[in-house]
Amino acid sequence: MICFLSFVSFAFSQITYNLNPTILLLKEKYSLINGIEKLKIFPIKKDSFQLGFTQNYYYNTNHPNFENHNGFYFPKGFGSISSALFYYNSKYISFSIGPHRIINNEYHKVLPQKKDSFSVNNDVPLESIENSKSLKFRNTGLSLHYSSLYLGYGNWNQWWGPGIHNSLVMTNNAEGIAHYFVGTSDYQPLVGDLKYYFKYMVSDVMHNNAGAKYFLSAYYFNLRYNNIELGKSRHILNGGYNDIPWSINDAMDVLITQNNIKYWDEIVDYYISANFPSSGLKIFLEVGFLNRSFNEKDPKVYSDHTMGSNLGLRKYSAFGYDELMFGFEYTRLVQGLYYDIIPTPNWYDNIKYNYSSYRGRRWAAHSGADSDDFLVFIGYINDRASIIYGVNYERHGVTYHFPPEVKFESRISVSFKYKNTFIYLNYENEYIEHYGFVDVNRNVWNETFEPGSIQRTQTLLISIEHTFSF
């Protein structure tokens, strides 16, 4: 499933710009039951425009929390995010503008410091003053289209892959990255019932901590045959060296030319998913491989030592009731045990690319480097309302340190839709042990904890959205 400004209906216009796991479940149930999976970048209706308003309020008792909420930052304290979204769609051109006004009343919290690739995890406070009392523009951009071909530029949030909790390569955990793109607007017929979808994108310039420019270049290719879907993507993080001249023109074609490829970080990602509409079941498996030079050795020899995976299922109309559903998702990015003997690079660990983060948050799997993440959930969903309860178990630094960070979390989300108004409530209760890797072996055997090891956080988010269609 590719969620790139997908539209279930006009009533969900702004909601699908601001994706979260509940919205993905609502969208998927609609698609699975009706046998429709729309990937369109903009609505089908021509010569139309819509105006939406969203008001978010949050309260948080400790360290930052929440993943996959379009890069929104919820530190200790309370605050609000006020936003508007205007978009226009015609036969050949579409554009959207999404100003956001952010007010954070943040309370200082002293936490053990996390370093390196763990410094961009979601529970680490951001220092930038940009996150407080600032005006930002999100989901803003321009698209030109002819027939089924689209090209344009914007900073819309993206998601690639069949998961709703994680993707190995692209999620909306971080703010949307400004990028250029070209691709098809939806699945296009190829042969018989076989259809395809394609997108090629290159990010605008980003800068690492040394001030060097770098880019993300990627393509996505999907094939669908009836209820079976195959996906492949390739991501190259390129640039990042002050002594190697590199520009956006180079980034535009690096996927084709392979120029300086031995210096760049590459991920090749695959997934397969199967839908069973008669039973309301969806199952999937996503696997990804890092590609590095290993000191001039052939990376293909060691590709199995770099594999990450994400697998899961979602079942709608469960236990004989149309409104009941359940599912699980398990992501594994644990670094191999023999990393100090056999070349075994870690996911998202390159400082030259800010550990695969944008403005302090990782754009791929939020659990991050050397981690695993298990989510199980059950819920009630109908056309107007939903309530979903989930339990999450997550570990960070599994190979890096003993004991690793361990997170237990319970969560509940409630939504209600009335005409063009959508109300969303999300509450999470999080408990972490060994935060910041402050504990060592003796703490485990003695069942003791160092100061700062145990962290508890409760976070509440309330969102009210309304959309006008013209």
Locate each region found by the language model:
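Low-complexity, highly charged intrinsically disordered N-terminal segments
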Residues: 72-116
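N-terminal periplasmic/intermembrane-space "pro-region" immediately following the signal or transit peptide
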Residues: 10-77, 85-94
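Short loop/turn motifs that connect adjacent beta-strands in outer-membrane beta-barrel proteins
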Residues: 43-48, 88-93, 145-148, 187-198, ...
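Sequence/structural signature of outer-membrane beta-barrel proteins
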Residues: 58-60, 66-69, 104-106, 149, ...
